């Protein structure tokens, strides 16, 4: 079984990345960095969690 991970950049919202053994840290265990802004990439399942914690819910009223 092959597991495919989808990464997203939290800064520029890009999805292109490179991996390097030199970039492996506790917060970035796979060593993935954005090729555009060099930020640490996050997995797509963490993007939804970050959006929920960073933004207040929007209430639409008429």
From Swiss-Prot:
Coiled coil: none
Induction text: By cold shock, 10 degrees Celsius (at protein level).
Residues that span the membrane, as ranges: none
Superkingdom of this protein's organism: Bacteria
Note: Uses the non-canonical initiation codon AUU, which may limit its expression.
Family membership noted in the UniProt record: Belongs to the YmcF/YnqF peptide family.
Annotated protein name in UniProt: Protein YmcF
Organism encoding this protein: Escherichia coli (strain K12)
């Amino acid at each position: 079984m092959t597991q495919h991970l989808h990464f997203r950049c939290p800064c520029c919202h890009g999805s292109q990345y490179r991996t390097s053994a030199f970039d492996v840290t506790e917060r970035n265990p796979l060593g993935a960095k954005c090729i555009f802004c060099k930020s640490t990439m996050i997995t797509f399942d963490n993007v939804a969690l970050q959006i929920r914690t960073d933004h207040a819910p929007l209430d639409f009223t008429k």
